[in-house]
Amino acid sequence: MPKSGLKCPVSSFFLLILYSVKTENMKILILNGPNLNLLGIREKSIYGETSFEEYLSGLRDFYTMVEIDYYQSNVEGELINKIHEVGFSYDGIILNAGAYTHTSIAIADAISAIPCPVIEVHISNTAKRETFRHVSFLTPVCR
């Protein structure tokens, strides 16, 4: 749990990466897809009231030995470009592709094309939401 006391949806995934890869001088990208720039103000009953900037600050405070970069885009091609850009040099990507999770073969192909481990995360429980959110094109290629 980050020092700020915030419940962070990606903190347990950080621990997984930290203990499965290495613990010093790690470089991780948190990559968020469409509408995640609205965390804290969008559908608070589903996504909560905490902005991603607050989560990110807590993660950086807690995981001081890790270089944490962050990128968010509402544009599919920009997410793919970022995966290509960092996928050969970073230690891991934590990806919340938002709605692209359920639609994007192109993002799945981008993940398949890189050696960097990618972990798929979501803030809400997609299995308990609309039926179309139960399918992920990304899960089979994440590692």
Over which residues does each language-model region extend?
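Extreme N-terminal starter segment of soluble prokaryotic enzymes
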Residues: N25-I28
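Short, glycine-/small-residue-rich phosphate/pyrophosphate-handling segment
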Residues: K128-R143
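Short acidic/histidine-rich motifs immediately flanking catalytic phosphotransfer sites
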Residues: V86-I93
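Short Gly/Thr/Asp-enriched flexible loops that form oxyanion-binding sites at enzyme active sites
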Residues: S104-P115
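Short, acidic/small-residue loops that bind anionic groups at enzyme active sites
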Residues: A113-R129
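Short beta->alpha junction loops
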Residues: D69-G77
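Glycine- and acidic-residue-enriched helix-capping/strand-helix junction motifs
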Residues: L38-E53
